[in-house]
Amino acid sequence: MEATAASTSLPDPGDFDRNVPRICGVCGDRATGFHFNAMTCEGCKGFFRRSMKRKALFTCPFNGDCRITKDNRRHCQACRLKRCVDIGMMKEFILTDEEVQRKREMILKRKEEEALKDSLRPKLSEEQQRIIAILLDAHHKTYDPTYADFGQFRPPVRGDEEEGTLPSRSSSAHAPSFSGSSSSSCSDQYTSSPDTMEPASFSHLDLSEEDSDDPSVTLDLSQLSMLPHLADLVSYSIQKVIGFAKMIPGFRDLTAEDQIVLLKSSAIEVIMLRSNQSFTMDDMSWTCGSRDYKYQVSDVAKAGHSLELIEPLIKFQVGLKKLNLHEEEHVLLMAICIVSPDRPGVQDPTLIEAIQDRLSNTLQTYIRCRHPPPGSHLLYAKMIQKLADLRSLNEEHSKQYRCLSFQPECSMKLTPLVLEVFGNEIS
C-alpha cells in the first residue's frame, strides 16, 4: 500500500463518542487518538513505529499469549507487537524519514501563512475600541431593558376594539407609538435626569407655521385611546436618545445649534432603531416587560398612525432583526444615524462628516474583525440601507404627526418636548 501523507488514519468523527474516555486497544492506557489505523496511546504508537522501521523480530519467552497492560507492556515485546497488529495497526501508515521531513515543512509553511494572514487581517485600533466601549456604556446608561419606568406613564387604554384590528390606508387614525407625545407632568418628571436635555434647550428655534393642505384629513378622536400612553413613552424615549447622543465621541465638539438640529432630525429614527431590541417577529409586536406594555400594530393605530407608516415600520423592524446585529454594531449604527452631515440646517457639515467617518470606519473594521461569515457578508451595506429606510419612515412620520398635532384635542396630550422636537422639524 502506498504511504499516506499522515502518520495517523482518522475515521469519521461520528464513529466514536467524544464524551466516552478513549482506551488504548493494546495496553488499556489512555488513548490519544487513532494512530496507524487504531486507537492507541502515545507509548504503543511509538513502539509500533520503531518496531516496524527496525523490522524487529521478537520472541515471547512464555506461551505467546501474554496479557498486555499499562504496567507490563514492556515485559513482552513480541506479544505487544502482536496485539498492535491484531487491533488493526498497519505499517503502511508509517511515514518514511523523507515524508516526515516534508510533513514538518508543510506544517511550518502553514503556520507562516497563517501568521501572515493574521498580520494582514484588520484589527480594531485602541481608539476604535475606546469608541465602541463609550457607545456601549452610553447605551446601557440610557436604555433600561427592564422597562421599569413605563409604570410612570399614563396607563395604556386599548378600548373595546380587538387587538388584531388594523387601520386602513389613509385612515384618519395615525398612531404615535413612535410619533411622540407625553403629558407635561411626565415630561417635567424626566427632564431632571442628568442624561437628558431640557426641552427649553430647543426653545430658541421657531415653531413651524405650516398648515395642513389636505382638508380631507380628519381624526376620529374616539379611536385614539393609546395616544396618552404612547405619547409619554415617546417623550421618555426622546430624552434617552438625547442622553445617548451627548456621549457620542465628538458630539459635544459641535455647536449647540448643530447638536439641536441633529437631535431633532434623528430622534424618531433612533427611537425606531432602539425599539428593535424589544421587537419580536413571532407576533410582530414590541414587548416591554409586562403584558400591559406589549404593543401590537393595533396599538400604534390607536395612537393616530395609518398603514402608510405602520407597514414599512414593521418591514423595517423585521429586516433589522434578521441582520442579527451585535450590540456593538447596533450602538455604532445609532451613533452614525445621529451624526449625519446631510441633515437640513446643519452649520458645520465638514466637522459632522469627520465624526461620522470615524464612526463608520469603526463599524466597518468591527464587522471585518468580529462578525463571522456568513452574517458579515455585505452587512455594512445592509446597515447603511437601513438608515435610508429610516429617512423614508421619518418623512412619513412627519406628515402623519402634523395631521395629528393640528387637532387641539390631540396636541393637548403632547408634552412640551414632543412639541418642540416633532412640531418644529426642519424640512
Swiss-Prot record:
A zinc finger (NR C4-type) spans 24-44, 60-79. It is found in: Nucleus; Cytoplasm. Zn(2+) 1 binds at residues 24, 27, 41, 44. GO terms for biological process: apoptotic process involved in mammary gland involution; calcium ion transport; cell differentiation; cell morphogenesis; decidualization; intestinal absorption; intracellular calcium ion homeostasis; intracellular receptor signaling pathway. Coiled coil: none annotated. A motif (9aaTAD) lies at residues 416-424. Residues 21-96 bind DNA. Zn(2+) 2 binds at residues 60, 66, 76, 79. Nuclear receptor for calcitriol, the active form of vitamin D3 which mediates the action of this vitamin on cells. Enters the nucleus upon vitamin D3 binding where it forms heterodimers with the retinoid X receptor/RXR. The VDR-RXR heterodimers bind to specific response elements on DNA and activate the transcription of vitamin D3-responsive target genes. Plays a central role in calcium homeostasis. Also functions as a receptor for the secondary bile acid lithocholic acid (LCA) and its metabolites. Homodimer in the absence of bound vitamin D3. Heterodimer with RXRA after vitamin D3 binding. Interacts with MED1, NCOA1, NCOA2, NCOA3 and NCOA6 coactivators, leading to a strong increase of transcription of target genes. Interacts with the corepressor NCOR1. Interacts with SNW1. Interacts with IRX4, the interaction does not affect its transactivation activity. Interacts with CRY1. Interacts with CRY2 in a ligand-dependent manner. This is Vitamin D3 receptor. It comes from Sus scrofa. The gene is VDR.
